[in-house]
UniProtKB/Swiss-Prot annotation:
This enzyme is a serine protease capable of degrading the native triple helix of collagen. Belongs to the peptidase S1 family. Keywords: Collagen degradation, Hydrolase, Protease, Serine protease. It catalyses: Hydrolysis of proteins, with broad specificity for peptide bonds. Native collagen is cleaved about 75% of the length of the molecule from the N-terminus. Low activity on small molecule substrates of both trypsin and chymotrypsin. This is Collagenolytic protease 36 kDa. It comes from the Eukaryota. Residues 1-20 form the Peptidase S1 domain. GO terms for biological process: collagen catabolic process; proteolysis. Its EC number is 3.4.21.32. Signal peptide: none annotated.
Amino acid sequence: IVGGTEVTPGEIPYQLSLQD
């Protein structure tokens, strides 16, 4: 997921900025 939000089990939603 690029420039989006990923939710992992037992984790809070975090934003990914792979597309710098």
